[in-house]
Amino acid sequence: MHGTVLPPLKKGWQATLDLRFHQAGGKTVLASAQHVGPLTVQRPFYPEEETCHLYLLHPPGGIVGGDELTISAHLAPGCHTLITMPGASKFYRSSGAQALVRQQLTLAPQATLEWLPQDAIFFPGANARLFTTFHLCASSRLLAWDLLCLGRPVIGETFSHGTLSNRLEVWVDDEPLLVERLQLQEGELSSVAERPWVGTLLCYPATDALLDGVRDALAPLGLYAGASLTDRLLTVRFLSDDNLICQRVMRDVWQFLRPHLTGKSPVLPRIWLT
């Protein structure tokens, strides 16, 4: 596997979660969930019979400087798993130590992953580094999104100070399709047009027809949204001032893409409806 080596941190929560999915009896099952510290999952749901819906639980009370969380998931051939969370991930102000979250998702041939976490909220003064990597095979299928909230715009609070590094990678058969990094420091938000909401959505494999359909769905976001298709990887990026529009557009794009990618109608995770 390729990727960036990150140095270990000390202090705070040192939590790990390793998930293994297999096929058994015609459906995807969570074969093992090994965890250390306050990272765990709820019991899987099966609203679509063979597809496994799983809710990932982050540490109670949010993530602070010095916390180091490592999440990995491995999907065996033919598995189909949807992973989400019951609520937003909150990164609180740090006195100097960095919070680090590593997420590595590995898909075998013919495996399908829908990685649909809730938004990540970064309070002013947070010092956070996130590193998410998807390792796919050519026949794997991926629908994933990443939604960042800088500050708490609902109450007029901006990400006026602090540091955020968000790195996102997609590899197919050990070749990089996407390697990008967002770096924000000390309230300098010009790289995101001073917008508090930053979103990315990924779909693999995709076609020109899907690209056209996604661009239509992005209309509510105006000029601050776009989509591209490179080597069958569809990448959607957008900026916004409005969380409700962001969340609605993300779900609209997911609902449009899912039937084409998986052959299944969209089934909203129950936790989204509560």
Curated annotation (Swiss-Prot):
Keyword terms: Chaperone, Cytoplasm, Nickel insertion
Identification of the protein by name: Urease accessory protein UreD
Subcellular location per the Swiss-Prot or TrEMBL entry: Cytoplasm
Subunit structure: UreD, UreF and UreG form a complex that acts as a GTP-hydrolysis-dependent molecular chaperone, activating the urease apoprotein by helping to assemble the nickel containing metallocenter of UreC. The UreE protein probably delivers the nickel.
Protein task: Required for maturation of urease via the functional incorporation of the urease nickel metallocenter.
Main location: cytoplasm
Family per similarity comment: Belongs to the UreD family.
InterPro entries: UreD
GO molecular function list: nickel cation binding
Cytoplasm found in the keyword field: yes
GO cellular component, one term: cytoplasm
